[in-house]
Amino acid sequence: MANYDVLKLDGTKSGSIELSDAVFGIEPNNSVLFEAINLQRASLRQGTHAVKNRSAVSGGGRKPWKQKGTGRARQGTIRAPQWRGGGIVFGPTPRSYAYKMPKKMRRLALRSALSFKVQENGLTVVDAFNFEAPKTKEFKNVLSTLEQPKKVLVVTENEDVNVELSARNIPGVQVTTAQGLNVLDITNADSLVITEAAAKKVEEVLG
């Protein structure tokens, strides 16, 4: 267990929290982390690429010339692959690039990503975001007070509409929940700002 300061939104210390070394203090497994990032990026691919094969290209129903007697090579259709404007052989077809990863590996990847952020001093724990209404200017001031870099991932315990709307128009700032935390978002961010309740929830899931 390691102690971390819990900050108020004005930057002052409100207390401390013990975070489990099993979640936030392991030696990052780079190979599993790399595999998890590739898996997530692969699942984001649309896979809608397609070309027309000889059956999909329009035309070509008539035989170009008779089979014998012309001295030329026999041809059955002008949409065969060797013809200009013909179908493509073995071209890309629509498919899903998604693949699966064992649950233990996925959890190890998340723990590795969180531990990596801790090692880089990229983890900030706050007591809570108590926004009564969406306030982008106020949210920017909070990030500035907490001395956060441009790319920040904000993690709340549950969905918080006011926080999401406050951060929506700030470039480089992304908001997610403890349940929706993923490796790609963590590694893309320079810093992680997590609420005390969200940190405990992450420990419950990954611990």
Swiss-Prot record:
Residues 50-76 are annotated as: Disordered. GO terms for biological process: translation. One of its GO terms (molecular function) is rRNA binding. InterPro entries: Ribosomal_uL4 (IPR002136), Ribosomal_uL4-like (IPR013005), Ribosomal_uL4_dom_sf (IPR023574). One of its GO terms (cellular component) is ribosome. The keyword Ribonucleoprotein applies. The keyword Transferase does not apply. It holds the Pfam family Ribosomal_L4. Keywords: Ribonucleoprotein, Ribosomal protein, RNA-binding, rRNA-binding. One of the primary rRNA binding proteins, this protein initially binds near the 5'-end of the 23S rRNA. It is important during the early stages of 50S assembly. It makes multiple contacts with different domains of the 23S rRNA in the assembled 50S subunit and ribosome. Forms part of the polypeptide exit tunnel. Belongs to the universal ribosomal protein uL4 family. Part of the 50S ribosomal subunit. This is Large ribosomal subunit protein uL4. It comes from Staphylococcus aureus (strain MRSA252).
